[in-house]
């Protein structure tokens, strides 16, 4: 008997487990999850910081504490940092890189919460702008419609989403860009 295993990105795996009522029967046993816990991510980031800042400190937590300040120190401080990353190594390294650039611009050698928040917003905006650029030609109204969802709760009802999109349609029609307006007319018809 042949059994297959699947690799899923973590966000896809979480969506399936939340939305599929037969998830445990159909998917759970066939998936190998690559999971990073906070200790592994601390070790990864500490190794990178040791090299980058030429630190000769043995323990990973001490490396973290040497490179952070205020409420970011300690295990809980590191875990606070991880809240911005979905526990993905690439996200953590990008966040820390941007946070250290922020600290260095302020003539600080350690990062603080403000640096992390700035880095998270900066990375998020860069990803959103990349999305806009990638899809602008085939979906001209993408920027207006996605902007309607800025600064709101991450989970919405279908009704709330539709109301946000309808409000975007009205805004687009008021501005009168013919290309975008014709696209909206097509979307409304379906």
UniProtKB/Swiss-Prot annotation:
Keywords noted in UniProt: Allergen
Protein name: Allergen Alt a 2
Lineage, opening ranks: Eukaryota, Fungi, Dikarya, Ascomycota, Pezizomycotina
């Amino acid at each position: 008997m042949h059994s297959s295993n699947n690799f899923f990105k973590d966000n896809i795996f979480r969506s399936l487990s939340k939305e599929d009522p037969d998830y445990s029967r159909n998917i759970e046993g066939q998936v190998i999850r690559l999971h990073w816990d906070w200790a592994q991510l601390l070790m990864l980031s500490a190794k990178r910081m040791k090299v980058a800042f030429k630190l000769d400190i043995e323990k990973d937590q001490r490396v973290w504490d040497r490179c952070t300040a205020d409420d970011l120190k300690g295990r809980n401080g590191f875990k606070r940092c991880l809240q911005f990353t979905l526990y993905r190594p690439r996200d953590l390294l990008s966040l820390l890189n941007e946070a250290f650039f922020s600290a260095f611009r302020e003539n600080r050698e350690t990062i603080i919460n403000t640096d992390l928040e700035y880095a998270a917003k900066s990375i998020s905006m860069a990803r959103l702008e990349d999305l806009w650029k990638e899809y602008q030609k085939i979906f001209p109204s993408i920027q207006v419609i996605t902007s309607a969802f800025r600064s709101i709760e991450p989970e919405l009802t279908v009704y709330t989403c539709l109301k946000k999109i309808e409000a975007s349609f009205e805004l687009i029609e008021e501005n009168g860009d013919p290309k975008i307006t014709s696209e909206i007319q097509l979307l409304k018809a379906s």
